[in-house]
Regions:
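Non-cofactor substrate-recognition interfaces
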Residues: 1-180
Length: 180
């Protein structure tokens, strides 16, 4: 937040203004937030009980990040370790063959609904919300029909969140993230 915006009256704000007014209504330590529950931002798949709550971890530093981060236990070793320790389930799908898999298949795209177990889909997938992104590659480089000029999945997701008024600000943040 821009400190100058703290002086802007809430009623003076108009959409598109550079300064977005805010007020600090309280302060707390990060440990005060542990076990707080929150609402799933993109409710495509229900991963199970206890998935959306604040947990404690010690591998994010002020040099590496903000100190509060989203974790993806299905895709990172550190995330998997801290999630398992706290009893947070990974976000996985059950395939039509009965296999438990991450949301992204072995080719680098979100599973298409037809490749998933019908009972799993019925019980756990918000078909309306997910179907627009089912079958999309997470990186354009994985899809031989796409180029660098085509819209990327991350941009499409950001635009969806913006259209649903679920995001405060979208910006690129370069950071280290091990992946294969």
């Amino acid at each position: 937040f821009n400190p100058k915006a703290a002086e802007v009256a809430m009623e003076d704000y108009k959409p598109g203004d550079k300064l977005v007014p805010y007020r600090v209504v309280g302060e707390c330590m990060g440990t005060d937030l542990v076990d707080s529950e929150y609402e799933q931002l993109i409710p495509w798949v229900n991963p199970g009980e206890g998935a959306f709550r604040v947990i404690q971890g010690d591998y994010v530093t002020t040099e590496d990040g903000t100190g509060i981060v989203h974790i993806a236990p299905t895709f990172g070793a550190d995330d998997a370790f801290v999630a398992k320790k706290a009893g947070v389930p990974g976000l996985t799908m059950t395939t039509a063959k009965g296999e438990t898999r991450p949301m992204v298949d072995m080719t680098g795209k979100f599973f298409v609904l037809e490749d998933l177990d019908a009972d799993f889909v019925k019980a756990n997938v918000n078909i309306e919300a997910y179907k627009e992104f089912a079958g999309r590659f997470v990186k354009n480089a994985y899809d031989p029909t796409l180029t660098d000029q085509d819209e990327t999945l991350d941009v499409a997701i950001c635009m969806m969140l913006k259209q649903q008024n679920l995001v405060f600000r979208i910006e690129k943040h370069v950071h280290n993230y091990p992946h294969c």
